[in-house]
Amino acid sequence: MPVAVMAESAFSFKKLLDQCENQELEAPGGIATPPVYGQLLALYLLHNDMNNARYLWKRIPPAIKSANSELGGIWSVGQRIWQRDFPGIYTTINAHQWSETVQPIMEALRDATRRRAFALVSQAYTSIVADDFAAFVGLPVEEAVKGILEQGWQADSTTRMVLPRKPVAGALDVSFNKFIPLSEPAPVPPIPNEQQLARLTDYVAFLEN
């Protein structure tokens, strides 16, 4: 059975996810093709469905995993997501040459991760070092600062600090493109540089529990 055609919208990604799940269920002997496994695993990561991603990885036959290195590459991204290693997510995505059926999904995953990181920083901090913020959103410092200025945040070129604007009701949810009411968080004082990324990782864990 041919691999489903890729599309860019979130609706099309959900439709593609359903198609890939059906292809796996209908596959002879319950064993799908490597492209189907690759798309399905990447789509689970895109939708932050880590439970299904883990179960899929466990049931992919070892012979298929060993013969198709892209599957291991996709799962390595999943491991970074599981560890809440935001800089590692971008690095791992960028380190691979993805197939044409997987690349659009990984690009969407990178963009979704970046939006999530922006939302987390806006909730967790009153200020953060620009270099640490850039690592968390996976962008060069100059590009990251330009992006936050376009969002109405502030940046101090002298101290190299980014000053986030707190989210308002209906702000972007940290999970994936969902809008939910958010209460105004209490002010958070600046934290020493070496603790910033660890603090953000802890904040992700708090929000997801």
Curated annotation (Swiss-Prot):
Chief site of localization: cytoplasm
* Protein location: Cytoplasm; Nucleus
- Please cite one Gene Ontology biological process associated with this protein: COP9 signalosome assembly
- Its domain of life? Eukaryota
Q: Mind listing the UniProt keywords for this protein, alphabetically?
A: Cytoplasm, Nucleus, Phosphoprotein, Signalosome
Instruction: Provide the positions where the record notes the PTM Phosphoserine.
Output: S175
PCI domain location:
8-179
Pfam families to which the protein is assigned, alphabetical: CSN8_PSD8_EIF3K
Gene Ontology CC terms: COP9 signalosome; cytosol; nucleoplasm; perinuclear region of cytoplasm
* InterPro entries from the UniProt entry: COP9_CSN8, CSN8_PSD8_EIF3K, PCI_dom
Q: What does this protein do?
A: Component of the COP9 signalosome complex (CSN), a complex involved in various cellular and developmental processes. The CSN complex is an essential regulator of the ubiquitin (Ubl) conjugation pathway by mediating the deneddylation of the cullin subunits of SCF-type E3 ligase complexes, leading to decrease the Ubl ligase activity of SCF-type complexes such as SCF, CSA or DDB2. The complex is also involved in phosphorylation of p53/TP53, c-jun/JUN, IkappaBalpha/NFKBIA, ITPK1 and IRF8/ICSBP, possibly via its association with CK2 and PKD kinases.
Which family, according to UniProt?
Belongs to the CSN8 family.
Listed under subunit, the entry gives:
Component of the CSN complex, composed of COPS1/GPS1, COPS2, COPS3, COPS4, COPS5, COPS6, COPS7 (COPS7A or COPS7B), COPS8 and COPS9. In the complex, it probably interacts directly with COPS3, COPS4 and COPS7 (COPS7A or COPS7B).
What's the name of the protein? Answer: COP9 signalosome complex subunit 8
Q: Which gene encodes it?
A: COPS8
